[in-house]
Regions:
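Solvent-exposed alpha-helices and their adjacent loops that cap or buttress functional pockets
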Residues: 19-22, 61-65, 92-95, 111-112, ...
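A structural signal for small-residue-enriched, beta-sheet-centric alpha/beta enzyme cores
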Residues: 72-73, 102-189
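A structural-propensity feature for long, helix-poor, extended segments
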Residues: 62-92, 96
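Structural motif
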Residues: 25-27, 99-101
Length: 189
């Protein structure tokens, strides 16, 4: 099942990226807070990613045909004092990336989607928007290159689950086995 899911995800990503190959460098950006398990999909995803930019540059003949992939985990505003968008702009410029793949945890609107789907889009994303912590948008308009968003819903607002919680938008829940699910989803992405 895992191999089929990974192949399906790779195929969908290929259709969303406007180009491929060594002449089309990509920056993979893991967004979120590494210190919060439900928000830590990205470090696990980046750990499983084959970063090739340094190899393509150092040994161009041996790595001909490889896409140049760089990775960045910019952290959160509270830890860095910088908006994720600012860090990504600098990285896109420094690496000459032609596209960004932004990986983030999301808030589910339905319990059926919680840790059960991978959402893809070509319009970018707004970090933190699912939990009411709106940051600056990460999209083609703000970065100057296409942005493919890869998101996994890992939390759900308690207000969506039942009576007595409708007015509380500050309480978010995760599955009991969130550690295992985040590890699996990070590896899949």
């Amino acid at each position: 099942f895992f191999r089929r899911a990974a192949a399906c995800l790779a195929g969908e990503l290929r259709t969303l990226l406007p180009g491929r190959g060594e002449a089309y460098p990509v920056l993979a950006a893991g967004l979120g807070n590494r210190g919060m398990t439900a928000d830590a999909v990205w470090p696990l995803a980046l750990e499983s990613l084959l970063v090739t930019r340094h190899m393509v540059r150092a040994l161009p003949r041996q790595f001909a045909g490889f896409t140049s992939v760089a990775a960045l985990a910019p952290g959160v505003l509270a830890a860095t004092g910088m908006e994720t968008l600012e860090l990504l702009r600098g990285a896109v410029q420094a690496t000459g990336s032609a596209a960004v793949i932004a990986i983030d945890a999301l808030a589910a609107r339905s319990r059926d989607r919680l840790c059960a789907t991978v959402q893809l889009g070509d319009t970018g994303l707004i970090p933190g928007s699912g939990v009411g912590n709106h940051r600056k948008a990460i999209n083609a308009e703000t970065l100057g290159v296409p942005v493919v968003a890869v998101g996994v819903p890992t939390v759900i607002a308690a207000s969506l689950l039942g009576e007595g919680t409708e007015d509380d938008d500050s309480l978010f829940l995760t599955p009991r086995d969130i550690d295992e699910k985040v590890r699996e989803l990070g590896r899949l992405i």
